[in-house]
């Protein structure tokens, strides 16, 4: 098969591993920087050009689109879909999951466990909003943040009011969530491929750090999932319509709570913690599914 990887840097661990996995199975692979693609959008023969050449005869595309280039990256992916190239994750599923608020609303509609989450536009509503999520401590998140950037723990109500008002003053969109103390600064990353959890790791925040992101110095270890955690992770990925997803859960007194559903989960941490060939499993999934050559929008909203 001829497989394209939408990635801006072929030296990244995840991109390198996907190239290795595909080539070792006899596939032809090309890394394509979405920002260097330009498109001919027409109803006869839609085209994508990359650095002067037309991209043709691709069987599948693996999107590894960074958060900062979501808009253009998903436009390029959508064009591949118009050309009948099989996407590992569809453009609509990626945009759905990238919008933190929209994804929380979709999960809540299906009754998936999550931290109580508040969203407001005006500083006048901050006091009511904090009452809604249970006062302090609360976690305040920038809707556009990634890798733990733009996430603040406000230990007291007073601190929460100050932080929310400061963000609002910058015209930033934020959501306010209850702090799950019993999680102890740890979360669980479940790696879902094709409706199954194929690997999971526990990420523990560094000393004195409530964020467990590995980019923030957290550590990863193997974890055994409960049946409920497994079911929750698969359901969250399905609601987003993602074939490949990293679902982040917190262990709480009321069961697993979904923090985020990531459409472009990194491979380095999960492969190191579990010893599994996750890149190979993604390519296996493509081999089984790309032959249908169809894209079908899954999930709703």
UniProtKB/Swiss-Prot annotation:
- Binding-site list for Mn(2+) 2: 260, 262
Classify the source by domain of life: Bacteria
Q: How is the cofactor bound?
A: Binds 2 magnesium or manganese ions per subunit.
The record's SUPFAM superfamilies line, in alphabetical order, gives: Glutathione synthetase ATP-binding domain-like (SSF56059)
Instruction: Output the InterPro entries linked to this UniProt entry.
Output: ATP-grasp (IPR011761), ATP-grasp_RimK-type (IPR013651), ATP_grasp_subdomain_1 (IPR013815), RimK (IPR023533), Rimk_N (IPR041107), Rp_bS6_RimK/Lys_biosynth_LsyX (IPR004666)
Q: Quick one: which residues bind ATP?
A: 141, 178-179, 187, 211-213
Task: Give the UniProt entry's GO cellular component terms.
Answer: cytoplasm
NCBIfam families hit by this protein: PRK10446.1, rimK_fam
Q: What is this protein called?
A: Probable alpha-L-glutamate ligase
Q: Which organism is it from?
A: Aliivibrio salmonicida (strain LFI1238)
Q: What broad taxonomic lineage does this protein's source fall under?
A: Bacteria, Pseudomonadati, Pseudomonadota, Gammaproteobacteria, Vibrionales
């Amino acid at each position: 098969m001829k497989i394209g990887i939408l990635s801006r840097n072929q030296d990244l661990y995840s991109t390198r591993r996907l190239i290795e996995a595909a080539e070792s199975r006899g596939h032809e692979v090309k890394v394509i920087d979405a920002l260097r693609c330009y498109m001919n959008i027409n109803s006869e023969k839609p085209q994508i050009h990359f650095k002067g050449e037309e991209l043709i005869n691709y069987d599948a595309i693996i999107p590894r689109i960074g958060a900062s280039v979501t808009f253009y990256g998903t436009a390029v992916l959508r064009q591949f879909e118009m050309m009948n190239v099989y996407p590992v994750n569809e453009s609509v599923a990626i945009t759905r999951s990238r919008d933190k608020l929209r994804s929380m609303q979709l999960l809540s509609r299906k009754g998936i466990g999550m931290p109580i989450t508040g969203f407001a536009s005006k500083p006048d509503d901050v006091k009511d909003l904090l009452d809604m999520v249970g006062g302090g401590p609360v976690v305040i998140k920038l809707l556009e943040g990634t890798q733990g950037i733009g996430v603040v723990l406000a230990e007291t109500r007073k601190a929460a009011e100050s932080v929310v008002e400061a963000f609002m003053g910058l015209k930033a969109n934020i959501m306010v969530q209850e702090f799950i103390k019993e999680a102890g600064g740890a979360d669980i990353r479940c790696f879902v491929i094709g409706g199954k959890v194929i690997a999971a790791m526990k990420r523990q925040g560094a000393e004195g750090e409530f964020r467990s992101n590995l980019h923030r110095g957290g550590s990863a270890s193997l974890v055994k999932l409960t049946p409920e955690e497994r079911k929750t992770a698969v359901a969250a990925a399905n609601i987003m319509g993602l074939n490949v997803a990293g679902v982040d859960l917190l262990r709480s007194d009321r069961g697993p709570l979904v923090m985020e559903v990531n459409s472009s989960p990194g491979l380095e941490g999960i492969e190191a913690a579990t010893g599994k060939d996750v890149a190979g499993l993604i390519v296996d999934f493509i081999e089984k599914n790309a032959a249908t050559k169809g894209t079908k929008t899954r999930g709703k909203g």
